[in-house]
């Protein structure tokens, strides 16, 4: 096996590794080269700090990939913690143990880093342990700890909506139904709108507007640069039916919206916003329930609420997934 490094951003496309993302159970939208390329173009600090890394087998076939960025003398997975929930390598499952060993063996030969701060590694995926063990074997000093916002609740979905409801504790099932009935009783029938090519721009405008109306840190998140990133995500992934912008319309008003991704059997809730004028009727909660229903109808087996240990996520029956961080230093 051979490890190849590249500092050329053109290799996001020239060495496209989307097939490896799909082959790896750890692969997510955040590992796709199209997502990482977009992140790099919008948030990359300096062009010469990119380090794309590929593993090739004896036949020269690409079997694994990981994108890094270097900040001073620290090596990090590419992807900011504010917008990238999971990070790290992807590869063919049968090669991952060897890839982890060869990766560290190649990295220690480089003199452009002293420490590695590797975030976004889910505890229930092999890469966390493989990278930790391989770094130890290479004589590096390794520390494992919780990542920032290091809990990502998720649901395992049954084949039907009724099956999902029946899988919940009675109290949660009752609350989901009660919120929808209360919204209809007090505001009239609601409608779920999923953005398509024609409606995307005005719906994104409304989503950004609602986001900036939020209280606290959420209200200042959607700065112009972040808005551009979200719009570029939509433009890149809506045609592939990966990007999902959903609204709940009540009384002729778009009361709440969610942005998510539908990717390889997993539907993810990436961001949300709601009109505070409707807060007492919880349209956002009703909308998330409808997002789950839509995911089930589309055959998804997982609904990932992503990082952030917020109480509302558990009202849908989610269970926590820990997301870990490896801090690796040269001795």
What are the residue ranges of the model-derived segments?
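Short amphipathic alpha-helical segments with coiled-coil-like heptad repeat character
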Residues: 25-26, 321-324
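Short functional hotspots where side chains directly engage DNA or cofactors
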Residues: 315, 325-327
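Alpha-helical membrane-targeting segments
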Residues: 329-331
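Acyl-donor binding region in acyl/amide transferases
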Residues: 70-148, 264-316, 320
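Conserved beta-strand edge residues that scaffold enzyme active sites
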Residues: 197, 309-310, 327
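A conserved beta-strand-loop-helix scaffold within acyl/acetyltransferase catalytic domains
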Residues: 2-59, 65-76, 121-152, 156-280
């Amino acid at each position: 096996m051979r490890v190849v490094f590249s500092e050329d951003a053109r290799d996001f496309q020239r060495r496209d590794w989307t097939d490896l993302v799909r082959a790896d159970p750890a692969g997510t939208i955040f590992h796709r080269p199209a997502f990482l390329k977009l992140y790099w173009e919008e948030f990359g600090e300096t062009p010469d700090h990119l380090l794309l890394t590929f593993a090739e087998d004896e036949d020269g076939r690409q079997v694994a990939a990981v994108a890094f960025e270097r900040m001073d003398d620290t090596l990090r997975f590419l992807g900011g913690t504010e917008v990238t929930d999971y990070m790290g390598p992807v590869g063919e499952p049968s090669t991952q143990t060897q890839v982890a060993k060869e990766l560290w063996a190649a990295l220690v030969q480089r003199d452009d880093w002293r420490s590695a701060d590797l975030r976004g590694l889910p505890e229930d995926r092999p890469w966390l342990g493989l990278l930790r063990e391989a770094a130890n074997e290479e004589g590096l000093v390794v520390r494992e700890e919780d990542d920032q916002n290091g809990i990502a609740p998720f649901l395992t979905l049954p084949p039907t909506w009724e099956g999902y409801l029946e899988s919940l504790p009675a109290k949660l099932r009752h609350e989901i139904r009660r919120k929808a009935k209360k919204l209809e009783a007090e505001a009239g029938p609601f409608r779920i709108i999923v953005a398509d090519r024609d409606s995307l721009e005005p719906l994104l405008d409304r989503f950004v507007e609602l986001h900036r109306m939020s209280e606290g840190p959420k209200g200042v998140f959607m700065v112009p640069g972040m808005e551009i990133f979200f719009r570029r995500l939509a433009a890149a992934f809506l045609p592939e039916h990966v990007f999902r912008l959903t609204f709940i319309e009540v009384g002729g008003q778009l009361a709440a919206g969610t942005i998510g991704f539908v990717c390889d059997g997993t539907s993810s809730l990436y961001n949300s916003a709601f009109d505070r004028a409707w807060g007492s009727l919880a349209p956002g909660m009703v909308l998330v329930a409808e997002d789950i229903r839509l995911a089930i109808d589309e055959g998804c087996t997982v609904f990932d609420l992503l990082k952030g240990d917020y109480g509302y996520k558990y009202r849908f029956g989610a269970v926590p997934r820990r997301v870990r961080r490896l801090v690796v230093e040269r001795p």
